[in-house]
Amino acid sequence: MAAETLAIQKRRMWIVTQVAPYSHGPAGVHRVLAQANTALSELALIEGFDPCCVSDVTTINPSEFEAGGILALFTIGETPFSTVQRTAIFSSWRSSNLGVLGIHSATDACHNWPDYATIMGARFIEHPWTQSFPIETVNREHPCVLNLPKIWNWQDELYVFSALSKNAHILLQTSPNNFDPQIAGTVGDREVFPLSWYIADPGITFYTSLGHFPEAWESTQYLQYIRGGIQWIRESLNSRNSISA
């Protein structure tokens, strides 16, 4: 029974949608949180995980993170993980017991937690542009993006990030030449802007900056892309820890 219980815990996927102070008002990701919860829960079930929707991270026992699984974060602001929770998350991530799925504004969270940037691969700086733009799929052989064309158009907030971690591998990118020149933003001398990436060392992370609008969560292409990220995290965890998800 104990081994069976542990296996169930290792298959859990926490779906954290804690966005204070952006839970009210005309702007912010709160408009799609219900859609995201539903879609991510369905994808978790399809991929063999037990979804657990969380709007208050203080309710999670840190030992649950140590058991492993996937921590899916659609967050913004100072998500109130306790010191013990942070330690458990970072340790479990580094040991590849816990994979992390970052959605959209998750890079604009936990600014007072230095290890969080290591887990995510970068920190959000600003998003001056909200527009349609062409996206280039950089590595079409990677499982996360197998369903995506080489070049495709999308409408979303265009995030500007701090320098990517050396461990982050870009999956999707766009050119600053595509940005609306009438809107000022931090372009600098960057030739490309990353939109999505993965980390495989020391821990396992898949991140996408896309997903601000309801249309994303109604898009079969977008949902298949997110499913690809979940599949890749699962298989990466399995290969390192022989976890049957």
Language model features with spans:
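Short alpha-beta junction capping motif
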Residues: 65-110
